[in-house]
Amino acid sequence: MAALAYNLGKREINHYFSVRSAKVLALVAVLLLAACHLASRRYRGNDSCEYLLSSGRFLGEKVWQPHSCMMHKYKISEAKNCLVDKHIAFIGDSRIRQLFYSFVKIINPQFKEEGNKHENIPFEDKTASVKVDFLWHPEVNGSMKQCIKVWTEDSIAKPHVIVAGAATWSIKIHNGSSEALSQYKMNITSIAPLLEKLAKTSDVYWVLQDPVYEDLLSENRKMITNEKIDAYNEAAVSILNSSTRNSKSNVKMFSVSKLIAQETIMESLDGLHLPESSRETTAMILMNVYCNKILKPVDGSCCQPRPPVTLIQKLAACFFTLSIIGYLIFYIIHRNAHRKNKPCTDLESGEEKKNIINTPVSSLEILLQSFCKLGLIMAYFYMCDRANLFMKENKFYTHSSFFIPIIYILVLGVFYNENTKETKVLNREQTDEWKGWMQLVILIYHISGASTFLPVYMHIRVLVAAYLFQTGYGHFSYFWIKGDFGIYRVCQVLFRLNFLVVVLCIVMDRPYQFYYFVPLVTVWFMVIYVTLALWPQIIQKKANGNCFWHFGLLLKLGFLLLFICFLAYSQGAFEKIFSLWPLSKCFELKGNVYEWWFRWRLDRYVVFHGMLFAFIYLALQKRQILSEGKGEPLFSNKISNFLLFISVVSFLTYSIWASSCKNKAECNELHPSVSVVQILAFILIRNIPGYARSVYSSFFAWFGKISLELFICQYHIWLAADTRGILVLIPGNPMLNIIVSTFIFVCVAHEISQITNDLAQIIIPKDNSSLLKRLACIAAFFCGLLILSSIQDKSKH
């Protein structure tokens, strides 16, 4: 009765809310959000540097999140590379001195805070020719003015960056008098034109005063109150912003440190100076402001201009625009023709007359419609991760942000369970379910930033290995049973795997290896195909006649294992193979194939394990050793219970080992050999009991059917900055943002899956002669792409 009510309820929901209506809703949401963000950009401005300098919040205790953009954490080498041959000057009081020390420590962490505090402090890194000076001018007075005035002279070398600020010393010396504030205003008014002149050739920042923690202030600092600090800040902002009459001031207000201090000043030792962690954050913001536009780090979107549109991207935009126009013309013509041939009613009989000609939906219409949809989807991809229309934020890991969503989807998955059509081991519904829940876990892992937590990282590595295990199992089973080594099958698989990634490489201007999982699966598919297709071709039908062929196949697999071991322990040979042109165009990332070597080596044995498992399973199945009936255990009760016990112990043992990992490099070294233990344990736990084999989660299986699209699409329309950050469609409400962006993301992935299937039927025909012609066209397309890519690379250099 409950099952009947569940099915009726599901039909009722599907009647009113289908996948199609969900996609329409997603499209409306995208248009509304794009319009809102465009309006916001026009009203507030498009300069993310202003947001970085003036706004933000803490994610947790020490992670600062600027409004609308991402901050990069600069390493020593990156900082030196950015600041080579540069001169940075800090002018001000003890607070500016603190900022100076924190900034210098990004370049040289060993630099010590020592020497006379009330004197100038020089720093120079000769390896990068970086010069950073602190100039002691605790008051805005004639002394500071003279220092700045010297730099305005044409004959004097000017600092590339000037960071200035002072006020608390004036409040302290003059006991917080109103006369001191008036004098401060006069002095800063006289300095403002000089700063403005310097700002035309250098980056000039005026650091507003941070609040103090009044309860901790010593007696000789009690007159420094937050009320007086606010008055001095207001004076500085008012005067510096009005120093130019007809245009915006070039002197940038560094006010974000105030926000940081408001959250952390309670941790101050004296109530006046910020704790070290806060100073490090402020210094890193300063580094981002100056260096992001120079080095253009992927995860540092603040202060970065929109990347220039390449020639290939322009051609892609033209192609999709023509496809949209072509489809609209085709649709209008087809619609008019349909109206002309509309069934009319016989006046005498009242019956409808049938049309003589019934126009079928042509391949051309499907082709144009698919490219039209794809063009609109690619426009959304570009808006999300290249056009800087939508906001981006840094990830921040907490245990709750990972484990709570995992529990939530687990409950949903258990709720939506149905009976399988067949009860074989790893049947289609079960493998779709497996792919589905693994993909959802991987998505949660990525968006929560859980890679920083090693036990979670190691378990996710097993899930990636399980995908590759399924690749080995699935393709081996197909070739072994069907014996179909035709070019049509190969082209269909390669097209479905690579179509979306090739389009994204063109539209998003990213190398093929950037979407590392697709190259990995593609190469392993070709390895499986070549292994089984090479002479002698051994398939199940042939092996059934003579057991000798089983040994022949095992010999083939043995040679494959030796070849894998050879490449795994010969990095030079591996790099020589994949550095050959044009393979290098596919597998190089940042000018070398190391990343590809690392990714391939990390799961080098698991595809072989999948093939071997498929061979053993199909051999046992053929000899009717397995009981795969509905509700029946896979083996006899004793053997089933024993194997279940071993599987559970093995599964838990691996989890305990992964959870106790302390060093990522060491665990990665062991992973290729031991990951199969947990994979096989899971398969046996899932398939030995008959009742477990007879049901599956339709919720997980639905996601499993679009798992590849979900994995690829997340790079740009769910995450941001090439997976380094999170896409923000709705700022200020993280939960609502995740719900809306996830809804749109899933709808897009599902639509792309359908588009890929439709195009695969048209572009990859079954007729061999037609297919060869199409392959020649595809080869010509890629040759053209290689030529254009080479032209682009030369123009960049």
UniProtKB/Swiss-Prot annotation:
Pfam families documented for this protein: Cas1_AcylT, NXPE4_C
Keyword Cell membrane assigned: no
InterPro entries named in the record: Cas1_AcylTrans_dom, Cyclin-like_sf, NXPE4_C
Catalytic center residues: 94, 270, 273
Keywords from the named record: Acyltransferase, Glycoprotein, Golgi apparatus, Membrane, Transferase, Transmembrane, Transmembrane helix
Tissue-level expression: Highly expressed in peripheral B lymphocytes.
Outcome when changing residue 94 to A: Abolishes O-acetyltransferase activity
Residues of this chain annotated as glycosylated in UniProt: 46, 175, 187
Source taxon at top rank: Eukaryota
Membrane topology (UniProt): Multi-pass membrane protein
A biological process from GO: carbohydrate metabolic process
Entry-linked SUPFAM superfamilies: Cyclin-like
Record EC number: 2.3.1.45
Cytoplasmic side: 1-18, 335-363, 417-439, 483-486, 535-547, 627-638, 693-698, 747-770
Chain ranges passing through the membrane: 19-39, 314-334, 364-384, 396-416, 440-460, 462-482, 487-507, 514-534, 548-568, 606-626, 639-659, 672-692, 699-719, 726-746, 771-791
MF annotations from Gene Ontology: N-acetylneuraminate 9-O-acetyltransferase activity
Biological function: Key enzyme in the biosynthesis of O-acetylated (O-Ac) sialoglycans such as gangliosides O-AcGD3 and O-AcGD2, which affect various processes such as cell-cell interactions, host-pathogen recognition. Catalyzes the transfer of an acetyl group from a donor, the acetyl-coenzyme-A molecule (acetyl-CoA), to the C7/8/9 OH-position of a sialic acid residue.
Family note: Belongs to the PC-esterase family. CASD1 subfamily.
Name recorded for this polypeptide: N-acetylneuraminate (7)9-O-acetyltransferase
Organism: Homo sapiens (Human)
Protein's gene: CASD1
